[in-house]
Amino acid sequence: MDNKTRKSLDKFYTKKDTAKHLIGVSEEILGVDLTNSPTIEPSAGGGAFSSQLNNVVAYDLYPEIDNVKKQDFLADFTIPNAENRIAIGNPPFGKKGTLALQFLNKCGYLCKAVCFILPSTFKRWSVQSHIDPELRLIYEEDLPLDSFEFDGKPYSLNCVFQIWTREMCEDMENLRISEKPAISHPDLTLWQYNGQEPSK
C-alpha cells in the first residue's frame, strides 16, 4: 500500500508506548484487567493495542499484521457475543471526524465501554451532540503531538483520549457537554464574519 493510499485511509498509527499507557489508564479508570478482558479493536492498524491484549478480536479493512480479521467494521456483520466487552483503539477519523463518530457510536452499542483516541474536536458540544445519548463520558486526556507515526516516522496530530461508557462506572462524573454553550453575554455580541447577523 503506497503512502497516498495510507493517508487517504487515515493509517496514522499509535506508538506502542502510547498504547501501553492508554491501556493502563483504561484499566485504572474502569477498574478492570483490560489485558485479559473481552476486547475488540475495530481498526487494528499496526496492532499497537491488540498486540498487548490477550482476549481481543481485532478487525481492519486492510490487515497488515497476523491475527487481524479483514473486515469493514462499519458494515453489517456478526460479532461474537461477549459479556462486559470493551472497545479500545485509534479509529480512522475521516473528514471532520465523521468516521470516528460512526466507530464510536457502533462500539458504544456493542460494548460496555469505549476507550478511543479521537480528534480534539470531540471535546466540543457540536460533536458530542451527535454521540449516542446513552453514552457517558467519564475520562479524557489530551495526547502529546508525538503519540503517532506514519510510515515508521513520528507524525503529529491533535488528539484526545476519551472513555465513554454504557451501564458501567455510573458513580463517576459525566464529563459530557449536555447543552450547547452560551454564545451571548450582556456586554458582548458575536457576529458572523460577514457582519450581517449575530451568530447562532
Give residue spans per PLM region.
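Class I S-adenosyl-L-methionine-dependent methyltransferase catalytic core
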Residues: 1-200
